[in-house]
């Protein structure tokens, strides 16, 4: 009986403890069967002894066949023992780590010797392999003391572990991966800055990423233990990138990006590892332009489009698969921030796929809208904008402009976010389309008695109200805080997220479509009807021009500012 069972057992409340051999004629009806929960409660209260024949405890805890009752003095003795006894596993110190690593190295060498001596006789080296695995398991104790990581590195423990990733027995490499995953756990690394820095640098210097990817190549995910090894390997990469974001570029260059694409293409059922691959892929490209370009050069855009094509007419089968789909959309959006990938997206018929998804009204509609926004924005989106008009994309986008779909549990895109993407796409087309494509676009705003102008002005009023409410909130905060604490950039960002960004896009569209007198007169009529002002639109657009872009592309910024100011003067 262990200590927990002894302490949790509650003896029957009787005047005195019965003798073990009291009432020897106790009945033995239970021939090996456990009594039910309602079996003879009165007798249970009286019969607390047990004989050799009656080994079944008549109480709720199912205990071993030993004396179930203890006296109060015995209980106190047990408590005293538990409180004073030293724990089995003492806190690891430097001396303990040195002994542990020495034993580990001995077992590595012994296993190598036995494998060389008996290469074709597994029975001969199997015992040494089991001992090696046990030594690896013992090293998990190091993860509880991250301050010892520098000593672990100094004694070449990390190098020895990484060498075992190429061990002939995949079980050994999986055990090493499991250990490395625990050693690099983010919460543990945060406990010791020096330990984290030392361990991460050692892993980088030893080209750990490349070794881990090589091990991934040989793991068979049809074997549960090896599938777990794949999952833990991905966790190691996630841990390292979270601590050192610049590592994302290194691990991609050492083969992780290519392996993930290969894993996504594999004809395997959807599982946790495929989901995790999509998460790591999204992380790799979200902040690294080098990784975005690399993704395009190894046909990553085509792989993403092929994977997403499965959801053009069918929704994901589970919440996990929906998360997988969203990760792919996010990855594609990040990839399209690289100029080189816009053309690959166009040639891969990404526009046609996104347009089809918008028409099908499945869960993929949300992601496709964001992808189109990224593909068509800025000067690099010119070809995609013109092509979108050519494939009759206007027939798809304007119904969504006229009426925002209602949000429900399956349509996770909020109203404001949906409208932001729609007006951003239309603004990009007005900016980038030339010739016949632009004429077809402008003609849309005069159809059906200028209904789209009416909708445009409705959005102008909606987001103007939002911005004015945000400005009042900011003014109130400024009155209660010191002026020194105010950050103009932070305030502007807050206003953008509060509706100013969408308002700027809406007002930009108003200026672009007001190039003809008939449209301009309709805009003025609606403004007067709702007590609006052209001055408001001009003010919004001047502020937009003043904060346009960044200093990295000064020529583009100057051209855009000149174009917007020209539109303002004409309006």
Please annotate each region the language model reported.
Residues 515-539:
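C-terminal/domain-terminus segments
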Residues 118-125, 145, 151-152, 157-162, ...:
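HEAT/HEAT-like alpha-solenoid repeats
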Residues 141-148, 158, 163, 167-170, ...:
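Short helix-loop boundary/capping segments at the starts of domains
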Residues 147, 197-198, 245, 289:
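Leucine-rich repeat
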Residues 124-138, 169-192, 205-242, 252-253, ...:
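Alpha-helical solenoid repeats of the armadillo/HEAT superfamily
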Residues 1-148, 181, 185, 198-206, ...:
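N-terminal "cap/leader" segments of large eukaryotic alpha-helical scaffolds
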């Amino acid at each position: 009986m262990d200590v927990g069972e002894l302490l949790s057992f509650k003896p029957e409340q009787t005047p005195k403890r019965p003798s073990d051999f009291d009432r020897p004629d106790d009945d033995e009806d239970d021939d090996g069967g456990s009594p039910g929960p309602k079996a003879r409660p009165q007798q249970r209260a009286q019969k607390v002894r047990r004989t050799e024949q009656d080994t079944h405890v008549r109480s709720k805890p199912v205990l071993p066949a030993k004396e179930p009752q203890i006296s109060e003095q015995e209980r106190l003795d047990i408590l005293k023992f538990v409180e004073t006894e030293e724990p089995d596993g003492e806190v690891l110190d430097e001396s303990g780590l040195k002994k542990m690593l020495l034993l580990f190295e001995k077992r590595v060498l012994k296993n190598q010797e036995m494998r060389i001596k008996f290469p074709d006789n597994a029975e001969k080296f199997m015992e040494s392999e089991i001992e090696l695995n046990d030594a690896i398991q013992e090293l998990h104790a190091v993860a509880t003391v991250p301050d010892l990581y520098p000593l672990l590195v100094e004694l070449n423990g990390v190098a020895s572990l990484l060498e075992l990733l190429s061990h002939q027995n995949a079980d050994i490499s999986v055990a090493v991966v499991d250990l490395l995953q625990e050693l690099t756990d983010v919460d543990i690394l945060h406990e010791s800055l020096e330990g984290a820095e030392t361990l991460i640098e050692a892993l980088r210097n030893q080209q750990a990423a490349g070794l881990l990817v090589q091990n991934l190549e040989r793991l068979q995910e049809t074997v549960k233990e090896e599938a777990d090894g794949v999952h833990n390997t991905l966790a190691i990469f996630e841990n390292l990138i979270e601590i050192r974001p610049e590592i994302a570029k290194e691990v991609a260059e050492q083969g992780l990006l290519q392996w993930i694409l290969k894993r996504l293409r594999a004809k395997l059922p959807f599982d946790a590892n495929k989901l995790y691959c999509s998460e790591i892929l999204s992380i790799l490209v979200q902040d690294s332009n080098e990784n975005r370009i690399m993704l395009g050069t190894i046909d990553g855009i085509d792989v993403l489009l092929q994977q997403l094509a499965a959801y053009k007419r069918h929704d994901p089968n589970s919440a996990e698969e929906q998360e997988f789909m969203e990760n792919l959309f996010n990855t594609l959006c990040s990839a399209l921030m690289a100029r080189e990938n816009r053309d690959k997206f166009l040639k891969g018929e990404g526009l046609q796929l996104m347009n089809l998804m918008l028409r099908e009204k499945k869960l993929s509609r949300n992601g496709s809208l964001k992808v189109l926004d990224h593909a068509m924005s800025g000067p690099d989106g010119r070809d995609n904008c013109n092509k979108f008009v050519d494939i009759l994309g206007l027939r798809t986008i304007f119904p969504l402009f006229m009426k925002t779909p209602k949000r429900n549990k399956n349509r996770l895109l909020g109203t404001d976010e949906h409208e932001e993407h729609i007006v951003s796409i239309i603004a990009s087309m007005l900016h980038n389309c030339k010739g016949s494509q632009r004429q077809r676009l402008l003609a849309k705003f005069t159809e059906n008695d200028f209904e789209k102008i009416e909708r445009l002005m409705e959005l102008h009023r909606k987001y103007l109200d939002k911005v004015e409410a945000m400005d009042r909130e900011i003014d109130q905060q400024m009155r209660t805080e010191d002026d020194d604490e105010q950050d103009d950039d932070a305030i502007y960002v807050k206003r953008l997220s509060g509706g100013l960004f969408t308002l700027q896009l809406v007002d930009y569209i108003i200026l672009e479509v007001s190039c003809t007198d008939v449209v301009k007169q309709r805009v003025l009529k609606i403004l007067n009807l709702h007590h609006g002002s052209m001055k408001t639109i001009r003010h919004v657009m001047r502020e937009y021009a003043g904060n346009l872009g960044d200093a990295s592309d000064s020529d583009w910024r100057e051209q855009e500012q000149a174009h917007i100011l020209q539109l303002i003067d004409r309006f």
